[in-house]
């Protein structure tokens, strides 16, 4: 077995997961238009809007931060591969359900019952996003330990540059997908200005610009759901288990604790 296979699997999984970045790219624009008439700052003067944003956006970020906090404890008890695959695979469900909920009530998602439903879905999606990011860093670190154990050197720079590449690639993929979808519904600078003027004069983003609303709900749900689901495929055969890594790490610690021979 080539030890670098583990890193290749992680790199491929990260690239396949790239569309999940759309949630972070598009969400605040969607929240601004759908819930706050194009101006997110109005949430600070309208209690109803503030509650909606706290539930929806708060759910997204709280879910992310909670899993980032508890993942280190989970990793001590379970294989990081298992945690990564579970969160990646199952978080595809809340992503997809966001669009299903939109299709059920496209103009009524500001009603409190739908706000609560979406808040739960955003919380679950954020939890998956946070857990996967933590696990990815840990798994890359494990790959570095394995490389040192088998080949005698630590390719920290090379391997973590791969993680940076995933981040930049994800941003690029998100831009391409969103650009294609926006172009399909004629969401251009001129039309955005016209929409802003119409909303300022009382138009509704959800009702009067439903094609834009649908495009944004699609972007934050379906491509990320697909990306999270297929990102599990490469890591199903990820070779490093918790037991094997503990064994390798113990050997490396003993090696580094020995005084260098003169």
Predicted regions and their residues:
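Membrane-embedded alpha-helical bundles of multi-pass transporters/translocases
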Residues: 4-262
